[in-house]
């Protein structure tokens, strides 16, 4: 019996690790996450972007320029923004002081809209929807792409057996080969 739950990313990942959550439908694969999860897919490519005020469009073209901006940067707790971002976090200890860890996209985007943060790191698909709203589309733009990676279904190693994982992987490959995955993508 499965039941969909809307959970903050950080909490969902902790629950996957503990085995109290069996599956998360959208997760980037990393070595750390692979210790606790099986991955099936990928089902799409995710692009992580920096979104900020329109007047920053020609002032921020890379992560080093982003770091020179005054103010906070909002990120989603538990999200993966790529190896360059991870390296920056290790090399720039002061960066931690400038991060606002949001529990989800709504909180992050509310902080941006109220100008309590200078920029936000976000999935491009969410930003594209945000920018369709007249007021926000006039005020904010995508500043740069910071990472692109495949997104998978993640299954908890504590909640899903190796045998079930192999079966899921087999059926995923069958759906890919039959064209069913592509038909689902096109129907969205």
Name the predicted role of every residue range.
Residues 1, 41, 67, 78-102, ...:
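Ligand-binding cleft/hinge of the Venus flytrap
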Residues 1-36, 168, 175, 183, ...:
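Extracytoplasmic small-molecule ligand-binding "clamshell" domains
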Residues 10-22, 38, 105-126, 133:
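Short helices/loops that flank or line small-molecule/ion binding pockets
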Residues 26-35, 86, 118-147:
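A ligand-binding cleft/hinge motif common to bilobed small-molecule-binding domains
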Residues 39-61, 154-156:
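Hydrophobic/proline-rich hinge and linker segments of small-molecule sensing/allosteric domains
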Residues 45-48, 135-172:
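Periplasmic-binding protein-like
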Residues 54-73, 88:
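Flexible hinge/capping segments at coil-to-helix
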Residues 63-72, 154-188:
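Extended ligand-binding regions for polar small-molecule ligands
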């Amino acid at each position: 019996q499965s039941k969909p739950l809307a959970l903050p990313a950080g909490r969902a990942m902790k629950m996957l690790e503990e085995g109290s959550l069996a599956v998360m439908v959208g997760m980037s694969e990393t070595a750390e996450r692979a210790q606790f999860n099986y991955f099936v897919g990928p089902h799409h490519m995710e692009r992580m972007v920096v979104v900020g005020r329109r007047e920053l469009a020609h002032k921020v073209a890379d992560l080093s320029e982003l770091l020179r901006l005054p103010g906070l940067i909002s990120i989603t707790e538990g999200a993966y923004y790529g190896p360059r971002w991870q390296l920056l976090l290790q090399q720039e200890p002061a960066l931690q002081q400038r991060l606002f860890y949001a529990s989800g996209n709504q909180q992050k985007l509310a902080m941006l809209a109220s100008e309590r943060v200078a920029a936000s790191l976000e999935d491009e698909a969410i930003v594209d929807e945000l920018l369709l709203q007249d007021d926000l589309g006039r005020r904010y733009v995508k500043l740069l792409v910071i990472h692109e990676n495949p997104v998978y279904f993640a299954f908890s190693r504590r909640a899903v057996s190796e045998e079930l994982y192999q079966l899921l992987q087999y059926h995923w490959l069958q759906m890919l080969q039959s064209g069913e995955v592509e038909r689902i993508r096109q129907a969205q």
